[in-house]
């Protein structure tokens, strides 16, 4: 389960626009928002791309994308 709060913070801190991130991911802005709200899950290739775009370390990746018991 994705820690959407932490991911949203990383996006805000990066200064990148969600439209730009969605375009780089090859999905619509709505598709990205569905993932950020927990309606749909990120797939491995999307996680890798987000980590590259946002400069997320492997340690932070685990906290954001693979923590158990994370609240939506």
Regions found by a protein language model. Name each.
Residues 27-41:
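Recognition helix of helix-turn-helix/homeodomain-like DNA-binding domains
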Residues 4-5, 30, 44-48:
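Short alpha-helical elements of helix-turn-helix
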Residues 9-10, 14-15, 34, 60-72:
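Short, charged recognition helix plus adjacent turn
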Residues 4-24:
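Short basic helix-loop element that most often maps to the first helix and adjoining turn
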Residues 16, 42-45:
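Residue-level signal for the short linker/turn that defines the boundary of a DNA-recognition helix
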Residues 45-60:
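DNA major-groove recognition helix of helix-turn-helix/homeodomain DNA-binding modules
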